[in-house]
Amino acid sequence: AFEFDRMMQIPEVTGILIQPMLTGTELFVGAKYEEKFGHVVLCGLGGIFVEVLKDVSSGLAPLSYEEAYSMIHSLRAYKIIKGTRGQKGVNEDKFAEIIVRLSTLLRFATEIKEMDINPLLATEKYVIAVDARIRIEKK
């Protein structure tokens, strides 16, 4: 409470966002519009692993749950998602749900040309978006 009051004394401050410090496996979901195919949805490990491992799975929107699970299971890093060496896996159902919901959103928000949600922090209980980037093109 003291720190909140102190921060609110700063003239330019109009509000403060407070969120819990979370831990988990970093995941990634994204999308890119391709002229010939429509929206391509991507998933994989997130954070720096997207660039380092280049282990990404893709599918054409809209996606079914079966297709989302297939994307997840086809990743080379799937053992990390499943849980390995004593580490618990992530909630695959929630990860698949996010992939499906993103693909559904793209059917209706056609102005979205690129989208990255990276990282998603995932545990066996939750999958929560930490950061996102969206590029929109209006016609």
Summary of predicted features, one role per range:
Residues 1-139:
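ATP-dependent carboxylate/acyl-activation modules
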